[in-house]
């Protein structure tokens, strides 16, 4: 298929810059978001994304449809619900979901859409808002290899490392492993910042020195400076990380993952402090405001 027209559903912190990068790479890009008032939606429109108010209009002519929304219920409703994407997408359109919804939900979506003459890839992303803006996301893809190969040029417009992980649901499985690391690394960065302040050492010194050695991590480089400055603007929201950690626990069938249990507890404490819509760097609040 010669892909020229793309629809992006969900023009939030991640979806908006992804749509903008598609425009920059020459794709005719239509965008849909439930609420048009969000600044991220306006930014997409200014960058050349044709923002529409109807799921039907957005989906009808798209060769590839990207979805980037909150959780598995949102994805299922958007795609399979009454008046959803599946009702209006053209035959054999390729739907690519970039949300984190878990392996089982992705497999069920793929199976259902195949019965309706549509194709599906689960393609969760990581790299945060910075990666979405810069087009350097890591994308973990599950689904038929032929669909992956067709989607690859499009995915290269929004990501840097794009990996076919296996059949439907495999991208989600790898993403859950990724989220274990993200949650625990954020805690490690927060504890390092907290300790540096208690010891009278500038957090910037710790970030610079430790970040270049074996203790370096994405969280230390990107989240720790925001922790130090109490800059909690999202990025990746606490409520979304908690959702992902729940999916991890469910996938593990509540098996022993004590690090995940700790991460859930600490991020829940931030949520109870009113921080559910703050970025994951707000984990430092669990230490400063406990």
Swiss-Prot record:
Recall the GO molecular function terms of this protein's record.
Answer: NAD binding; NADP binding; oxidoreductase activity
* NAD in keyword set: yes
| Gene3D superfamilies, per database record | N-(1-d-carboxylethyl)-l-norvaline Dehydrogenase, domain 2 (1.10.1040.10), NAD(P)-binding Rossmann-like Domain (3.40.50.720)
Q: What InterPro entries has UniProt attached to this entry?
A: 3-OH-isobutyrate_DH-rel_CS, 6-PGluconate_DH-like_C_sf, 6PGD_dom2, 6PGDH_NADP-bd, HIBADH-like_NADP-bd, HIBADH-related, NAD(P)-bd_dom_sf
Chain residues that bind NAD(+): 7-21, 100, 243
Keyword annotations for this protein, in alphabetical order, are: NAD, Oxidoreductase
Its EC number(s): 1.1.-.-
Q: Which GO terms describe its biological process?
A: organic acid catabolic process
Report the superkingdom from the record: Bacteria
Q: Which cysteines are joined by disulfide bonds?
A: none
- PROSITE patterns referenced in this protein's UniProt entry, alphabetically: 3_HYDROXYISOBUT_DH
Task: Write out the catalytic residues in the record.
Answer: 175
A Pfam family the protein falls into: NAD_binding_2
Which family does the record assign? Belongs to the HIBADH-related family.
Could you tell me what this protein is called?
Uncharacterized oxidoreductase slr0229
In its UniProt entry, the species of origin is given as Synechocystis sp. (strain ATCC 27184 / PCC 6803 / Kazusa)
